[in-house]
Curated annotation (Swiss-Prot):
Cytoplasmic compartment spans: 55-108
Description of how the protein assembles with itself and partners: Homotrimer.
Stimuli inducing this protein: By copper deprivation.
Annotated membrane topology: Multi-pass membrane protein
GO BP field: copper ion export from vacuole
Protein name: Copper transport protein ctr6
Species of origin: Schizosaccharomyces pombe (strain 972 / ATCC 24843)
The keyword Transmembrane helix belongs to this UniProt entry's keyword annotation: yes
Positions in the Extracellular compartment: 1-33, 130-148
Cystine residue pairs: none
A Gene Ontology molecular function term of the record: copper ion transmembrane transporter activity
Transmembrane segments: 34-54, 109-129
Length: 148
C-alpha cells in the first residue's frame, strides 16, 4: 500500500467557514466534484438556474393555491357544491400538497448547496432566485421564504 504524497486522487474539500475556493469543491454529491475554473463556472450557472427554477416553482405553487381558494370560496358561497364538483376538487388538495412537497425538497437541496459556504455559490443561488422572483412577480407582492 502506497500512502505517499504523490497520489493523483483528488478529495473533496469541505470548509466550515465562508470561502471563495473552488479547487476540490464538492457540491452536495461526491460526483459533483469541481477541479478547475471551467467546471466551477458551469456549476455556478447550473446553481443559478436551480435558484431561478425554485422561485418559478414557488410562484406556480402560490398561483395554484390562490386559484383553488378562489374557486372553492366561489362555489361554497353560491351553494353549488354538487357531487360532480366535489369529486373534481378532491384531487386538487392532493396536487397542492405534492407541489408543496416538491418545493420543500427543492429548498432543502438549495440549502445543502449553500452549505458549501462558498461565497460564489451562495451568490449564484441569490442571483438565480432574484431573476426567478423578478420574472414571476413583476407586479405582485409575495412573502420571501427562509430556506434558500
Amino acid at each position: 500500500m502506497n500512502h505517499g504524497g504523490n497520489s493523483t486522487m483528488r478529495h473533496c474539500s469541505m470548509k466550515m467557514t465562508f470561502n471563495t475556493d473552488y479547487d476540490n469543491l464538492c457540491i452536495v454529491f461526491k460526483s459533483w466534484h469541481i477541479g478547475n475554473l471551467s467546471q466551477f463556472l458551469l456549476s455556478l450557472l447550473a446553481i443559478a438556474i436551480l435558484g431561478y427554477l425554485f422561485e418559478r416553482l414557488r410562484s406556480f405553487t402560490s398561483l395554484k393555491e390562490t386559484e383553488f381558494q378562489r374557486g372553492y370560496a366561489g362555489q361554497q358561497s353560491e351553494g353549488l357544491l354538487t357531487h360532480h364538483s366535489k369529486s373534481l376538487k378532491s384531487g386538487r388538495p392532493f396536487r397542492l400538497c405534492a407541489l408543496y412537497a416538491v418545493q420543500l425538497v427543492f429548498s432543502y437541496f438549495l440549502m445543502l448547496v449553500a452549505m458549501t459556504y462558498n461565497a460564489y455559490v451562495i451568490l449564484a443561488i441569490a442571483i438565480g432566485a432574484a431573476f426567478g422572483y423578478r420574472r414571476s412577480h413583476c407586479d405582485t407582492v409575495q412573502t420571501v421564504g427562509l430556506c434558500h
